[in-house]
């Protein structure tokens, strides 16, 4: 039935809009129909003269959110915020990571979300330095940092919140130092956001702030900030981008070279992750912070 319908409709149009790389089966079907059309041209059969990737067009539409969409995303963010607060209150040494995840999911469902927008990251201690660690059976310890990256989906729109905090309720001095560096970088990145700037400008600001912080703390020695940035020495500790588009998907579609416009929604979530290394003082080991 689909083949017959496509054949009938394609004979009526000069332009074909198709989502490239979305379905191998659909592409094969369309290609076979067009091939048959070309072989029948002598008999007067018409066929599309141009083929466009409709994915790029749809992506550009999805980049700009209207008031209704933003309202939905705000509600999703509210649910996720409450879930993070619930998890923080529940958190204490002796709990398992999966127990914290269960608290998040309970709050999502309680307020109308059908499911998480992405697999929840609940990472304690050394796991906080693993970017996409899924909640496991590790037991939280007194001196751990707990990193939670979790968000719900509501009415087709995703939310994405990351928070990092001490399981004991009190930062050690090294933990606080790293936390303050990351928090400052996030605030500075947010400050410059406005229509017209390049998407990656906030990332550049976050990189500079974190690089300076790493120098000040002593995690990077004998290097100027320009040397750190030029040689990407910060990537030992901050190896991902600061943000991504957010919308119907948590990593939503859209061209990152597009200047920012009113209605675009994206995350700002810098981080710093210090894995054990002989070059680094042990007091900083296994501190993973993302905000």
PLM region spans:
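Active-site neighborhoods and metal-handling regions in enzymes and metal-associated proteins
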Residues: 1-291
């Amino acid at each position: 039935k689909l083949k017959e319908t496509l054949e009938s409709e394609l004979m009526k149009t000069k332009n074909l809009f198709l989502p490239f790389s979305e379905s191998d089966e659909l592409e094969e079907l369309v290609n076979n129909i067009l091939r048959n059309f070309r072989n029948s041209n002598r008999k007067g059969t018409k066929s599309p003269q141009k083929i466009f990737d409709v994915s790029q067009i749809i992506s550009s539409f999805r980049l700009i959110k209207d008031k209704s969409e933003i309202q939905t995303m705000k509600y999703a963010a509210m649910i996720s915020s409450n879930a993070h607060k619930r998890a923080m209150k529940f958190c204490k040494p002796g709990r398992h990571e999966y127990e914290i995840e269960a608290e998040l999911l309970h709050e999502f469902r309680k307020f109308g979300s059908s499911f998480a927008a992405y697999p929840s990251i609940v990472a304690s201690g050394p796991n906080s330095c693993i970017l996409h660690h899924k909640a496991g059976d590790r037991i939280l310890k007194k001196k751990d940092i707990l990193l939670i990256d979790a968000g719900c989906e509501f009415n087709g729109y995703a939310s994405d919140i990351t928070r990092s905090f001490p399981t004991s309720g009190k930062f050690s001095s090294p933990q606080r130092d790293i936390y303050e560096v990351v928090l400052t970088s996030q605030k500075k990145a947010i400050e410059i956001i406005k229509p017209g700037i390049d998407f990656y400008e906030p990332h550049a600001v976050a990189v500079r702030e974190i690089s300076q912080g790493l120098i000040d703390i002593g995690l990077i020695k004998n290097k100027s900030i320009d040397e750190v940035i030029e040689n990407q020495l910060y990537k030992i500790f901050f190896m991902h981008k600061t943000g991504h588009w957010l919308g119907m998907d948590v990593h939503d579609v859209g061209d990152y070279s597009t200047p920012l416009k009113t209605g675009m929604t994206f995350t700002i979530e810098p981080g710093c992750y210090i894995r054990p290394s002989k070059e680094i003082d042990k007091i900083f080991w296994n501190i993973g912070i993302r905000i």
